[in-house]
Regions:
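Short glycine-rich, Thr/Ser-proximal phosphate-binding strand/loop in the N-terminal lobe
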Residues: 2-54
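Short beta-strand segments
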Residues: 10, 71-75, 110, 140-147, ...
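Short acidic-glycine loop/turn motifs at beta-strand connectors
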Residues: 22-25, 81, 153-157
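Short beta-strand-loop/turn "lid" adjacent to the catalytic site in phosphate-handling enzymes
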Residues: 59-101, 106-108, 118-126, 141
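N-terminal Rossmann-like NAD(P) cofactor-binding subdomain of oxidoreductases
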Residues: 113, 117
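Glycine/GP-enriched mid-protein hinge/lid loop-to-helix segment characteristic of carbohydrate kinases
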Residues: 131, 135-161
Length: 161
């Protein structure tokens, strides 16, 4: 079993939340959170370089600060090549290539509601609304944020709407 240190983030128009975690290559092993999460005001940053410098400084106290990967769930439409996104209602540009250079690891960008939809099958507690049997059909994920976030999930494939 191999364990890697990863950086995950939820970057919205108001706040950016970062967490370092240990992730096993065994899918049965639950990721372990490392250190305290970091919450920063997105509006305090005009450049991702200063944002990620603060993130790296926060997690530098951990024993293993070399991230093996990073995943950023960002409020906004990700470009078709998956390498950039502008955070909605801000001027903050997130670029996976630049972020990867700053953090010395590969960075993956996804839409924040894409990430939410992908998490649905792993939810521990869910409550059905409405009657009838639960069918293995397309599921919708809706939620408030900087706007109304939406995604659909079918057969474990998520699509932001």
């Amino acid at each position: 079993m191999t364990v890697a240190t990863s950086l995950v983030a939820d970057i919205g128009a108001t706040n950016a939340r970062f967490q370092c975690c240990a992730i096993s290559d065994d899918p049965a092993v639950v990721p372990v959170l490392l250190g305290e999460p970091l919450v920063l005001s997105t509006t305090s940053y005009v450049a991702q370089s200063s944002l990620l410098t603060d993130v790296a400084a926060h997690f530098a106290a951990l024993a293993d600060t070399q991230f093996s990967s990073a995943l950023f769930a960002v409020a906004g439409p990700v470009t078709l090549d998956g390498r950039a996104v502008e955070v909605v209602n801000t001027g903050l540009q997130v670029d996976a290539n630049e972020a990867g250079q700053l953090l010395s690891t590969a960075v993956t960008l996804v839409n924040d509601f894409h990430a939410q939809a992908m998490a649905v099958p792993f939810a521990q507690r869910m409550q059905q609304l409405g009657g009838g049997p639960v069918l293995p059909l397309v599921k919708g994920v809706l939620g408030p944020g900087s706007g109304l976030g939406m995604a659909r999930l079918s057969n474990r494939t998520a699509w932001p709407l």
